[in-house]
Swiss-Prot record:
Gene3D superfamilies: Aldolase class I (3.20.20.70). This is Phospho-2-dehydro-3-deoxyheptonate aldolase. Keywords: Amino-acid biosynthesis, Aromatic amino acid biosynthesis, Transferase. The keyword Transmembrane helix does not apply. InterPro entries: Aldolase_TIM, DAHP1/KDSA, DAHP_synth_1. Stereospecific condensation of phosphoenolpyruvate (PEP) and D-erythrose-4-phosphate (E4P) giving rise to 3-deoxy-D-arabino-heptulosonate-7-phosphate (DAHP). It comes from Haemophilus influenzae (strain ATCC 51907 / DSM 11121 / KW20 / Rd). It comes from the Bacteria. Its EC number is 2.5.1.54. It is an enzyme of class 2 (transferase). It catalyses: D-erythrose 4-phosphate + phosphoenolpyruvate + H2O = 7-phospho-2-dehydro-3-deoxy-D-arabino-heptonate + phosphate. The gene is aroG. Pfam families: DAHP_synth_1. GO terms for molecular function: 3-deoxy-7-phosphoheptulonate synthase activity. GO terms for biological process: amino acid biosynthetic process; aromatic amino acid family biosynthetic process; chorismate biosynthetic process.
Length: 362
């Protein structure tokens, strides 16, 4: 009878699984690409700066800027190399963190990011993707540019999170219980986007949930299944990204959301995503959103503490076409503003912060 029961269990298990491949344990990549002293110090300092901005102790603007997604490490390094002097130039007014997104949530199907599909040819060499991602994060941090990423599952943070200075939970996963639990244990600040329908309640609920301790299932650095116990994350905040009914970056929208935040007892301020529904998915409109947000800041508003921008070396986007060479430095997911517009945008944001200081000191 015992043998028969075992056979039944096996026969009914994994009936839709094609195959199962082993993944490298996190420790293998942490030992291969350890964080240098310089990189570790940068991450620690940037997390501290983000904490101070989020908690109203620093009047600078937190700026998360970079490609929609990373598909070409060489272009990512060039972007970081160009961003470094701008981070230094505007350090008194902006805390600039590079957007380094390796995983892409999809509404239906599509390329899921460099970790899942590093070679863009449907081979799904996930172990290689993890290696490439960690090596790239190491190189970017060693350049003196801190990194930001989106967290989509409970396991990849064990491979990469020590290099992340700020994290995001996307609009499609903000309502997810496991992502709220994950955020409660991440060592960096985490932004929750409002829902795709534009609603902000799910994000505010997520912040409250992530502030509390949780238990969840993940893996250890050695790859063993484990129960993770968290302390709670006090550095969570909302990101306004617009919704099905339109943008939500206007002064009126920000005021309304801040009133809701104030009711929760938290500091009433927000991060604004210049892209996605706030730009109606038209990448050039990010510059219009920037101008509106800069006006709010320059007139003295302290309700916007941070912004998010989709930017690349070359503006626009491209499709992956077999046999056709890719345009170097151009997105293969959401369209981005190009480098020249990115430089102008950062100058405008810096000027707005300086103007706010003058407006509030009078």
């Amino acid at each position: 009878m015992a043998k028969e029961k075992i056979e039944i269990v096996v026969a009914n298990d994994d009936t839709r699984i094609e195959k199962v491949d082993q993944v490298l344990p996190p420790i293998a990549l942490l030992e291969k690409y350890p964080a240098s002293e310089q990189a570790a110090a940068l991450v620690k300092q940037t997390r501290h700066e983000a904490h101070n901005i989020i908690h109203g102790k620093d009047d600078r603007l937190l700026v998360v800027i970079g490609p929609c997604s990373i598909h070409d490490p060489k272009a990512a390094i060039e972007y970081a190399t160009r961003l470094k002097p701008l981070r230094e130039k505007y350090k008194d007014s902006l805390e600039i963190i590079m957007r380094v997104y390796f995983e892409k949530p999809r509404t239906t199907v599509g390329w899921k990011g460099l970790i899942n599909e590093p070679y863009l040819n449907d081979t799904y060499r996930l172990n290689d993707g993890l290696r490439i991602a960690r090596k790239l994060l190491s190189d970017i941090n060693d350049l003196g540019v801190p990194a930001a990423g989106e967290f989509l599952d409970m396991i990849t943070p064990q491979y990469l999170a020590d290099f992340m200075s700020w994290g995001a939970i996307g609009a499609r996963t903000t309502e997810s219980q496991v992502h709220r639990e994950l955020a409660s244990g991440l060592s960096c600040a985490v932004g929750f986007k409002n829902a795709t329908n534009g609603g902000v309640k799910v994000a505010l609920d997520a912040i409250g949930a992530a502030e509390a301790p949780h238990y969840f299932l993940s893996v250890t650095k050695f790859g063993h299944s484990a129960i993770v116990s968290t302390k709670g994350n006090e550095d969570c905040h909302i990101i306004l990204r617009g919704g099905d009914k339109g943008p939500n970056y206007s002064a009126e929208d920000v005021e309304k959301v801040c009133a809701d935040i104030e009711k929760t007892g938290r500091i009433p301020h927000v991060m604004v995503d210049f892209s996605h529904a706030n730009s109606s998915k038209q990448y050039k409109k990010q510059m219009d959103v920037c101008q509106d947000v800069c006006n709010q800041i320059a007139f003295g508003s302290k309700q916007i503490f941070g912004v998010m921008v989709e930017s690349h070396l070359v503006e626009g986007r491209q499709d992956l076409v077999d046999g056709k060479a890719q345009t170097y430095g151009q997105s293969i997911t959401d369209a981005c503003i190009g480098w020249e517009d990115s430089e102008r945008l950062l100058q405008q944001l810096s000027d707005a912060v300086i103007a706010r200081r003058k407006a509030t000191s009078n």
